């Protein structure tokens, strides 16, 4: 057994152990007071790196959720604005429907047109002023916008909102068969009285659709009226609607004279004696209308005193009379009625409520005036056009001109908006087209909103899981750490006692000196 005074190994050992115990005790107290297992890199360097990455991811996910909520707010702002625009369009169509009946006077139609123009101003005002955080939403500039919805770059959702101003919506494409070819004027050889089958090309951008053939003749259930009926029966598939106007009009007012051997659509009317100029006493129109239930043709006089023969159901109109009788009718469509095969087919109008071209081919389609070489009347309008005049081009493409005489009457157009019957019909189509366009935009935005909501739900769950993972690494387990604290506290106290005893052991050396 050896005794040393200069170096107290036991005391040094007790001191070293005591320092470590105090360090552990301090660390345990720090963890208990902060609630964190990792307070500094030395506590768990690799764990801290992982926990910091998870904390960053959680914070970024939280911002992504806020971004998605901002995007939802923008989409909802635009959606509510367009909802108001659709209500305006519904009102415009209601007023157009109100104007589309000849019980209205020109003044009452002008009043309706004035209301519609005010409504269009408000529709454009909504399109130009709806904004979110200074960004215009409905002017067309909100295109291909991206929203970061993830913790890492390029995790985005894209959204675009087209323009909803009146000059960008409400497109209507109108095409009406030629009124200089066989589809309109009399055909002396009657080669246009035949079977016609139309083929609508690239209806949905890809497919062609062929409809059943229709006989063009003067019999009931035939003619472009029957053709129009078939087209409308499948309008949802073909993407177009059809209307027709079969009318023969004199080139000048009715002249005085006698009409001999008058036959219309195979029904013999006979001789009409002493017809007065302008058919002043109505004997010519009365004679024709007395058999209209058999001919399907109704006669009337226009404001200029010209006779109009109108096909009630869209069958062709065949008129025959003895030589020189055509002069009494005033020429025009009746210039050749002394021939044996004189017929008027009429004009077929196709309308599509968007801006795409209408492409037609088929069997004998030129016989109803739809060959491009025949000069098909075609025009595309948008909702803004309601503010102006529907000019002669619009009138012809919309089918307002049944023949050359009517085209001359409408050479300056058909007036503004709903101030005419045909104009009111066009405005109705425009309102439908505009509403469809807005509904498509709203549908797209609804899909974006649903995507954002789903994203928020997913990110929220992910954020919770990331937070849980971070907590598992960073946060302290109080039960475990309390046990550690008790251990370190006892060790610290016992260490102090041991150090005191180690120092006291050196006193034993004095006994050797006594």
Curated annotation (Swiss-Prot):
It is found in: Secreted; Bacterial flagellum. InterPro entries: Flagellin, Flagellin_C, Flagellin_C_sub2, Flagellin_hook_IN_motif, Flagellin_N. The keyword Secreted applies. Keywords: Bacterial flagellum, Secreted, Virulence. Signal peptide: none annotated. SUPFAM superfamilies: Phase 1 flagellin (SSF64518). Coiled coil: none annotated. The keyword Heme does not apply. Flagellin is the subunit protein which polymerizes to form the filaments of bacterial flagella. Important for motility and virulence. Belongs to the bacterial flagellin family. Heteromer of FlaA and FlaB. FlaB is located proximal to the hook while the remainder of the filament is composed of the predominant FlaA. This is Flagellin B.
């Amino acid at each position: 057994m050896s005794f040393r005074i200069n170096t107290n190994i036991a005391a040094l050992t007790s001191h070293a152990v005591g320092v470590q115990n105090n360090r552990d005790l301090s660390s345990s107290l720090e963890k208990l007071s902060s609630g964190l297992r990792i307070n500094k890199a030395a506590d768990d360097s690799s764990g801290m790196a992982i926990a910091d990455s998870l904390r960053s991811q959680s914070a970024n996910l939280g911002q992504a959720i806020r971004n998605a909520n901002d995007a939802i707010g923008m989409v909802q702002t635009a959606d509510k604005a367009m909802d108001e625009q659709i209500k305006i369009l519904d009102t415009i169509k209601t007023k157009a429907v109100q104007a589309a009946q000849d019980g209205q006077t020109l003044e009452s139609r002008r009043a309706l047109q004035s209301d519609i123009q005010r409504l269009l101003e408000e529709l454009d005002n909504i399109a130009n002023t709806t904004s979110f955080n200074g960004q215009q939403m409905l002017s067309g500039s909100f295109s291909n916008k991206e929203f970061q919805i993830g913790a890492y770059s390029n995790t985005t959702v894209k959204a675009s909102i087209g323009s909803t101003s009146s000059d960008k919506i409400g497109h209507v494409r109108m095409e009406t068969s030629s009124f200089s070819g066989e589809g309109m004027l009399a055909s002396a050889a009657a080669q246009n009285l035949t079977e016609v089958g139309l083929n609508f090309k690239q209806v949905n951008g890809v497919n062609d659709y062929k409809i059943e053939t229709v006989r063009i003749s003067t019999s009931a259930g035939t003619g472009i009226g029957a053709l129009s009926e078939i087209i409308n029966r499948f309008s949802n598939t073909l993407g177009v609607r059809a209307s027709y106007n079969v009318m023969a009009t004199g080139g000048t007012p009715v002249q005085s004279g006698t009409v001999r051997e008058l036959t219309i659509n195979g029904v013999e009317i006979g001789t009409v004696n002493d017809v007065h100029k302008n058919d002043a006493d109505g004997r010519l129109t009365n004679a024709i209308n007395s058999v209209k239930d058999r001919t399907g043709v109704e006669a009337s006089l226009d404001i200029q005193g010209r006779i109009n023969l109108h096909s009630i159901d869209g069958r062709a109109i065949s008129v025959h009379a003895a030589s020189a009788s055509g002069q009494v009718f005033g020429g025009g469509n009746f210039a050749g009625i002394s021939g044996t095969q004189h017929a008027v087919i009429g004009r077929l109008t196709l309308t599509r409520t968007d801006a795409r071209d209408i492409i037609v081919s088929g069997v004998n389609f030129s016989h109803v005036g739809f060959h491009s070489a025949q000069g098909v009347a075609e025009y595309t309008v948008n909702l803004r056009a309601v503010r102006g005049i529907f000019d002669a081009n619009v009138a012809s493409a919309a089918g307002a001109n049944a023949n050359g005489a009517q085209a001359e009457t409408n050479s300056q157009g058909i007036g503004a908006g709903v101030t005419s019957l045909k104009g009111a019909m066009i405005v109705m189509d425009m309102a439908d087209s505009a509403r469809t366009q807005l509904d498509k935009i709203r549908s797209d935005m609804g899909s974006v909103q649903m995507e954002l909501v789903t994203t928020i739900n997913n990110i929220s769950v992910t954020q919770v899981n990331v937070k849980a993972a971070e907590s598992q690494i960073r946060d302290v387990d109080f039960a475990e750490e309390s046990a550690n604290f008790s251990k370190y506290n006892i060790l610290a106290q016992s260490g102090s006692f041991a150090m005191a005893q180690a120092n006291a052991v050196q006193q034993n050396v004095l006994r050797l000196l006594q």
